[in-house]
Structures are given as structure tokens and as C-alpha cells.
């Protein structure tokens, strides 16, 4: 059995795991002469295909085997037709993958054999359809049959010997592979054991060295502590008085310096607090003054806006009144002019009491069209002088105006603002 695997594939599956097997039928029956050679050839082709392609697919494998003269087809169930004819000549190939999974048949494409030429007599006899009478004597002699039997026996012995040799070779190969694997495993186990022993020895040596160093350090520390204690006891008795006096003096000086520093810090803090309070009071007063000034300015601006709005309204009302007065004056002047014209006509009619002359009659009898075409007589209009208005800007005299009326019209003049 030969195995070959490719890690990745594209078209037929993500992975292809190929395994070559011989069918069970071939093992049960008589062995074929070229069975081992065909399996070896197929395994060699598989190895070449795997080495030649980075990602081996089922299509590429079929192409490689087809170029070498082999045909690959999926195995059909045993009950279908055509299985008995090809069961002895194919090599079983098992492919496992995501999409291409199953058993495939691989067999050598056999070339068509040339038929032996027939004699003319046989052709003629077959063509005419005549049956040839067989002689009661057999065609082959017995000596030839014995030789054939012996040859078959020899061939069977050789086949058995070849089969035994192949089995021995396979067993030797398996034993060699197993021995190699066992030797590799034993070598790996030995190397691991050696590395573990070395690491344990190193760790033990390190632990021993560290323990020795610790023990020496402890012993030296104990001895130094004992000697230091003894020397300190001796020196402490001597220097205790001196150190006590010096420490008392230093403590007194330190307390005095600390008290002075604290007093200075407190005084500085008080002065800073006072200055900050003064600055804050000044800032508050300034802000209050600014707020008051802004409020006063805002109130003044509002008052000015209110006064200006009132003045504008007053001016608008006065202008409207003046316009109305002017219109009334114009209307009165027009009425006076009409009244005067009517009075003048009445006077002329009263004065002309004499009978009508022929010219007047003719003029009166003129057609209406000529009368319409005659130009109208101009009417005298009186020119009126505009009223002069004076307005005092003082707040106490708001609403009071000085008016002057024209002497010709006699009507009161209009009031306005300058």
C-alpha cells in the first residue's frame, strides 16, 4: 500500500489525501504478473504529480495519469455492469477531501492487439458457410499437453516464489520502517532523557550554589551582627552621654527654628490673605460700579429711544394734519374760484339785457361739434402761500406750534414742525 497527501487543493477539494490499494478480488484470485509493477508505477506518478504541483487537484492528477497512459474513473458499485471485466486489471485509489471524496479506478489503457492472419482456406470455408468435418484424432499430441502442464506448474511455482519474495520485501520494508521509527523514537527519548538529566543536574548545581551562598551570607551576617552588637554595646556606653547632650541641643535648636519658621509662614499667610481680601473687595466694588454704570446707560438709552419714538410719532401726526389742512385749503380755493366764475357769468348775463344779434344767433346755432372743438377759456387760479410753522425743541413746549395764516385766503393755517 502506498500513500501520498497534498495539503491544499482548489477545484475538487480543499485537501486531497490519496491512498493506493489493491482490490480484494485480486488478492483472492491468482496473482497477476505485473500487479506490483503497476502499483509501483502509479505511486511514482503520484509522487511526481505531488512534487510538480504546489496545490494538487483531482483534475491535475487525472491529467498527469492520462499523459502517462492511465485512465482514472470513479468506482461504481459492484452490482452495476462492467465491474467484473475490469476488476482484475485496475488499481484502487482512495481520495479523501471536502468535495473529491471516494474511490477511483486507475488502469493502463491497453493497445489493440493485431489479429493473426487467417488462411485462405479457412476464410473460404467460413465465407461459403460449409462445416468442416473434425477428425476423431485430437489435433495436439499428448506430449505437448504434458509440456504445457509442466510449463504451467513451473509458472505457478515462479509466481509463488515471486509472491513470497514480494511479501518478504514488504515485510522487510515494514520492519525497516518500524525499526527506523523505533530507533528515531528511542533516540528522541534518549535525547529528551539526557536533556532532562542535564537540566536537573544544572538546576541541582545552581540550587546547591545558591544554598551555599545563602548559608555563607547568613553565617557572615550572624558573625558581623554579633561583632557589631558587641562593639556597639561597648561604644554606646561611651558615646551615649555625648550623643544625648548633642541630641538635646540639636532638638532644642530644631524646635526653635521650626517655631520661627512657622511664625514667619503664618505672618506671610495672614498678610497674603489680607491683600487678597482687599483686592477682592476692590474688584467687587469695581464690578458693582461697572454694573451700575451699564444699567444707567441702558436706562438712558431706553429713555432716549422712547423719547425719539414719541417725537417721531408726534412729527408724523403733525405732518398728516398739515397735509390734510393743505388739501382743505386747496379744495376751498377751488370752490371760491368756481363761485367767483359763476358770479361773473351771472353779472354778464344781467348786464346784457339787449336782444340777441344775428351774429350771436348764428354762434348759438352752430353745431355741437364746432362747440366741442372750441378751446376752453382759462380759469384764473389764486396762488396760496405755504404756511410757515415753527416748533420749539424744548421738552416743556412739546405739542405747541406757532402758525401763520395767509392774509388773502382768510382760512386758518396748518401747523407743522421744522
From Swiss-Prot:
Stretches assigned to coiled coil: 292-330
Phylogenetic lineage: Eukaryota, Metazoa, Chordata, Craniata, Vertebrata
Main location: nucleus
Biased composition range(s): Basic residues: 127-149, 157-171, 187-211, 245-259
The keyword Nucleus is annotated on this UniProt entry: yes
Bias (Basic and acidic residues): 260-273, 359-379
Compartments reported by the entry: Nucleus; Chromosome
Name the record gives this protein: Testis-specific H1 histone
Region (Disordered) location: 114-273, 344-418
Highest rank taxon of the organism: Eukaryota
Transmembrane segments: none
Keywords: ATP-binding, Chromosome, Coiled coil, Developmental protein, Differentiation, DNA condensation, DNA-binding, Nucleotide-binding, Nucleus, Phosphoprotein, Spermatogenesis
Modification Phosphoserine occurs at: 38
Matches recorded under PANTHER family: SERINE/ARGININE REPETITIVE MATRIX PROTEIN 5-RELATED, SERINE_ARGININE REPETITIVE MATRIX PROTEIN 5
Gene: H1-7
Amino acid at each position: 500500500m502506498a500513500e501520498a497527501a497534498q495539503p491544499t487543493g482548489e477545484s475538487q477539494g480543499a485537501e486531497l489525501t490519496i491512498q493506493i490499494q489493491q482490490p480484494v478480488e485480486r488478492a483472492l484470485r491468482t496473482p497477476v504478473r505485473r500487479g506490483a509493477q503497476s502499483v509501483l508505477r502509479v505511486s511514482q506518478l503520484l509522487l511526481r504529480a505531488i512534487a510538480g504541483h504546489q496545490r494538487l487537484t483531482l483534475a491535475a492528477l487525472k491529467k498527469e495519469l492520462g499523459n502517462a497512459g492511465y485512465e482514472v474513473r470513479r468506482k461504481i458499485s459492484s452490482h452495476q455492469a462492467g465491474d467484473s471485466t475490469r476488476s482484475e486489471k485496475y488499481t484502487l485509489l482512495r481520495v479523501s477531501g471536502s468535495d473529491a471524496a471516494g474511490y477511483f479506478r486507475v488502469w493502463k489503457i491497453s493497445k489493440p492487439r493485431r489479429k493473426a492472419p487467417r488462411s485462405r482456406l479457412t476464410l473460404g470455408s467460413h465465407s461459403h458457410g460449409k462445416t468442416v468435418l473434425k477428425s476423431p484424432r485430437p489435433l495436439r499430441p499428448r506430449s505437448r499437453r504434458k509440456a504445457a502442464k509442466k510449463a504451467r506448474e513451473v509458472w505457478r511455482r515462479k509466481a509463488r516464489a515471486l509472491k513470497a519474495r514480494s511479501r518478504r520485501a514488504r515485510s522487510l520494508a515494514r520492519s525497516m520502517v518500524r525499526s527506523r521509527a523505533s530507533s528515531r523514537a528511542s533516540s528522541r527519548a534518549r535525547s529528551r532523557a539526557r536533556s532532562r538529566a542535564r537540566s536537573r543536574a544544572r538546576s541541582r548545581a545552581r540550587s546547591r550554589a545558591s544554598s551555599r551562598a545563602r548559608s555563607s551570607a547568613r553565617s557572615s551576617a550572624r558573625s558581623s551582627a554579633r561583632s557589631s552588637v558587641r562593639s556597639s554595646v561597648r561604644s554606646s556606653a561611651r558615646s551615649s552621654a555625648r550623643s544625648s547632650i548633642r541630641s538635646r541641643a540639636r532638638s532644642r535648636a530644631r524646635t526653635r527654628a521650626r517655631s520661627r519658621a512657622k511664625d514667619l509662614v503664618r505672618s506671610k499667610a495672614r498678610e497674603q490673605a489680607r491683600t487678597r481680601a482687599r483686592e477682592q473687595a476692590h474688584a467687587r466694588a469695581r464690578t458693582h460700579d461697572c454694573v451700575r454704570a451699564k444699567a444707567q446707560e441702558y436706562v438712558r438709552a431706553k429713555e432716549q429711544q422712547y423719547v425719539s419714538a414719541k417725537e417721531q410719532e408726534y412729527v408724523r401726526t403733525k405732518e398728516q394734519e398739515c397735509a390734510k389742512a393743505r388739501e382743505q385749503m386747496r379744495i376751498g380755493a377751488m370752490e371760491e374760484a368756481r363761485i367767483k366764475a359763476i358770479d361773473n357769468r351771472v353779472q354778464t348775463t344781467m348786464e346784457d339785457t339787449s336782444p340777441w344779434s344775428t351774429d350771436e344767433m348764428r354762434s348759438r346755432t352752430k353745431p355741437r361739434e364746432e362747440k366741442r372743438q372750441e378751446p376752453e377759456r382759462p380759469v384764473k387760479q389764486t396762488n396760496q402761500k405755504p404756511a410757515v410753522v415753527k416748533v420749539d425743541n424744548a421738552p416743556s413746549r412739546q405739542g405747541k406750534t406757532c402758525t401763520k395764516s395767509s392774509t388773502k385766503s382768510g382760512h386758518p393755517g396748518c401747523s407743522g414742525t421744522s
